[in-house]
UniProtKB/Swiss-Prot annotation:
This is Probable sugar isomerase R00627. Belongs to the rhamnose isomerase family. It comes from Rhizobium meliloti (strain 1021) (Ensifer meliloti). GO terms for molecular function: isomerase activity; metal ion binding. Pfam families: AP_endonuc_2.
């Protein structure tokens, strides 16, 4: 397997921190043992956990107003895979990459799969793009795609999704994620019912072409790019879609795609209960779909989401097999650093949820002891589980301190010298 960071750099970085980590791990193990928790069992689950990296996430993001290019930006999907391999090598928590078509489209899929394999990466869910126009396409998505009033435009969007499935099959992917920007900006612009009927008809055509071992994830979003209405605006509509399409259709939850202050963890619980939780796009937000680093704003909410996931995992909930992926835009940070810290924050939330005293929590819930139920969750959340995460990385040939190891490696400066600088800047999220 090709390693992007020198093992000598990694060994030196780990050597300077190993003794302190050993003491911290032993100390935490003693404290958890007093609570009846086996730290090694928690570490094993954390070590086995993985979250997919979005291919577009390793490039510099932007806003509606401007995009400021960064040094060493990937020129193509092959460069992106190398950056993703750095994240996996140091965190040992991101073994798969999620591609976006047509952004990542190549003529030689065999070479792409071989590159991923050489770097120790697999390919997660495929992402279609009918929210922007690709060069040379016959019909514009300005006024919609899968729900467009024009049948030829809808057929073009359907064919694009079918192409994504074919590309995914060649790469070993097993899922298709569909998010559309379809909607309206003015009252009366769109007939809500007819637009949704057209969307469902289009999605049924895509669903019918899915291989037997594939899943399709539909993603809801309250607003943007349409600001009056979106065709798939919330989890209720998303659930209706999954029910209408069939057993291979599931709801994908992006943490930034909800109205402010929505109880996302309860939505997660509902979708688990009715066997329609497909997975997540993890990120964080303050106001809307901000696509900030996961755990950077509201780590407690992330923990509460994982509390529901671990609850389902613990009771072996029927049909529970969610896919996990990061989906962020990195405007002012090194994307590799942001994705590494985000992957670690997801792992942190998982570890914290694993140490919740579920027997005590269930008892307090039955007794309607609101305060102690809340404190039970907070006890787990306030526990510093970093020694578990770091030890899991170390034992899996990763970095105790991934960001420090990355900076010591000089990787960004090296690729900046190899990859031509992107001239100028413009608007656009990616």
């Amino acid at each position: 397997m090709t390693l992007m960071i020198s093992t000598s750099v990694l060994d030196a970085e780990n050597a300077s921190r190993r003794d302190a980590l050993t003491r911290d791990y032993e100390s935490l193990g003693d404290r958890l043992a007093r609570r009846g928790i086996d730290i090694d069992a928690v570490k094993a689950k954390v070590a086995a956990y993985g979250v997919a990296v979005p291919s577009w996430g390793v490039g510099t993001g932007g806003t509606r107003f401007a995009r400021f290019p960064g040094p060493g930006e990937p020129r193509n999907i092959f460069d992106k895979l190398e950056d993703c391999a750095v994240i996996q090598q140091l965190t040992r928590a991101t073994p798969a990459v999620s591609l976006h078509i047509p952004w990542d489209k190549v003529s030689d899929l065999g070479a792409l799969k071989e590159k991923g394999s050489a770097l120790g990466l697999s390919f997660d869910a495929m992402n279609s793009n009918t929210f922007s126009d690709a060069p040379g396409q016959a019909h514009s998505y300005k006024f919609g795609s899968l729900s467009h009033t024009d049948s030829a435009t809808r057929r073009q969007a359907i064919e694009h999704n079918l192409e994504c499935v074919e590309i995914g099959k060649a790469l070993g992917s097993k899922a298709l994620t569909v998010w559309v920007g379809d909607g309206s900006n003015f009252p009366g612009q769109s007939n809500f019912t007819r637009a949704f009927e057209r969307y469902l008809d289009s999605m049924k055509a895509v669903y019918a072409a899915l291989p037997d071992d594939w899943r399709i994830f539909t993603e809801h979003k309250m607003f943007e790019p349409a600001f009056y209405s979106t065709v798939v605006q919330d989890w209720g509509t998303n659930y209706l879609i999954a029910q209408e399409l069939g057993p291979k259709a599931f709801c994908l939850v992006d943490l930034g795609h909800h109205a402010p202050n929505v109880n996302i963890e309860m939505i997660v619980a509902r979708l688990i209960q009715f066997k329609k939780l497909g997975g997540f796009h993890f990120n964080d937000s303050k106001y809307g779909d901000d696509d900030l680093d996961t755990g950077s704003i509201d780590p407690y909410r992330l923990f509460l989401v994982f509390n529901e996931l671990v609850d389902a995992e613990t009771r072996a909930a029927n049909g529970f097999d969610p896919a996990h992926m990061l989906d962020q835009s990195h405007n002012v940070t090194d994307p590799i650093e942001s994705l590494m810290t985000s992957a670690m924050e997801v792992g942190r939330a998982y570890a914290q949820a694993l140490i919740v005293d579920r027997k005590a929590l269930a008892g307090y819930q039955e007794e309607n002891d609101a305060l102690m139920a809340s404190e039970t969750l907070k006890t787990a959340f306030r526990t510093d589980v970093e020694p578990i995460l770091a030890t899991a990385r170390l034992e899996n040939d990763g970095a105790i301190a991934p960001v420090a190891a990355y900076r010591a490696s000089g990787y960004r400066a090296r690729v900046a010298a190899e990859r031509p600088a992107v001239a100028g800047g413009g608007g656009g999220i990616v």
